Amino acid sequence: MAQPMLIDLEELVERLDRIGVRLCLPSKRQQIEQLEHEAADPDLWQDPQRAQSLLRRLSQLRDLVQEWETLSQQARDLLELRALASDDLELAGQVEQEATELAERVRQLELRLLLTGQYDGHDAILAVHAGTGGVDAQDWAEMLLRMYLRWAQRAGFAAEVVDLLEGEEAGIKSATVEVRGPYAYGYLKGEAGTHRLVRLSPFDAAHRRHTSFALVEVLPLVEEDDDVEIREEDIRIDTFRASGHGGQHVNKTESAVRITHLPTGIVVTCQNERSQIQNRETAMKILKARLLELKIRQRQEEQARLKGKPVVTGWGNRIRSYVLHPYTMVTDHRTEVSTPNIQAVLEGEIDPFIEAYLHQQAAEGEETAAASDR
C-alpha cells in the first residue's frame, strides 16, 4: 500500500493559478519584450546607470515569469505521477519529496509577490549602531552584525562590510554592510529599528543583568535614481588613515574617506577598500542611499500626518527584543511573532520575522486600499 500523500497537489495547482492571475502574465511578457528591445539598442551603454537599471529589471521579470512557469508545470507533472504511484512505494516517496520541495518554492514565490515597493527589488545598505551602555551595547551591535551576515549567507546574498568602527574593549561602535542580491532591500527593510538585548553581562564582574540597545538602518541602494542629486558644492570630503581595533592605524596612507553632506549634516565614511578612489566611490553610494532614505521617510511622514498616524523612526522605533535571562525568547513587537530558540536567531534564522512583517504590511495595505474605495 502506498504511503499517504502529505502535500495537497491540487491545492498547490490552484495557488499557482491564483499567482498567475496576480502576476498579470500577459503584461509581464509584454514588458519583457519591450525591455529586450531596449537592451538591444547599441547606444544603451552610453548611459551606464540606465543600462544597469534596465538589465536588472529585465532579469527580475524573466526570473519571475520563468519561476512561475516552471512551478506550474512541475505541479501538474506531479499530479499525473501521483496517479501512477498508488501501488509503487518508491515512486510515491519520490513524488512526496518533490511535492514538499515544490510547496516551499511556491511559498517563496508568494512571498516575493509581497515585495511591490518602488525600491524593493534593489540592493541594500544595512548599518548597525551601538546604543548607550558602553561595551555591552558594542558587543550587542557586533552580535547583530554577525546575525545579518549569517542571514545573507543563508539567503544567497553577497554581503560586504564597507565600514567598521570597532570598540575600544570589545564589539563595534558601528558597521555598514552592502547587501547585494534580488530584492535585498525588500526583504531587509523591516529590520530597521531598535533591537533590545537582555542578558547577564559577560563584562560585569558581578555578572548582573544588563539591557543593551542597537539601532539598525536599512537603505535602498539605487545608484541610478534621478530623485537624488549631490552637488559638489554641497559636500566636504576628508581623508584619513584607516584604523583597526582600539583606534590603531592599520594603513600608512590616507585611504579612508569621510564625506559630509553640508545641507543635511549627513556624514558617511568608508575605509574598507584598498584605495582612496574605491572608498570615495563606496562612500558616495552610501550617501546617495541615505539621502534617498531621507526622502522616503519624509514622504511617509507626510502621508502619516494626513492620516493622523505618527511615524516612529530611529531609536524610538523598538521592533524586537532578545531575552537571554531570566528566560530565552525573541519577540517581534510589531507582529507578535516569537521563538525561544534565540541561538538559532542569532545564527541568522530570522526569516519567520521577516515574512511575518511582510505579510502584516501587505494586509495593512489591502485594508487601506479597501477603505479608500468606500
Curated annotation (Swiss-Prot):
It is found in: Cytoplasm. PANTHER family: CLASS I PEPTIDE CHAIN RELEASE FACTOR, PEPTIDE CHAIN RELEASE FACTOR 2. The lineage of its organism: Bacteria, Pseudomonadati, Thermomicrobiota, Thermomicrobia, Thermomicrobiales. Methylated by PrmC. Methylation increases the termination efficiency of RF2. Its main location: cytoplasm. This is Peptide chain release factor 2. Belongs to the prokaryotic/mitochondrial release factor family. GO terms for molecular function: translation release factor activity, codon specific. Keywords: Cytoplasm, Methylation, Protein biosynthesis. The gene is prfB. InterPro entries: PCRF, Pep_chain_release_fac_I, Pep_chain_release_fac_I_sf, PrfB. It comes from the Bacteria. HAMAP family: Rel_fac_2.
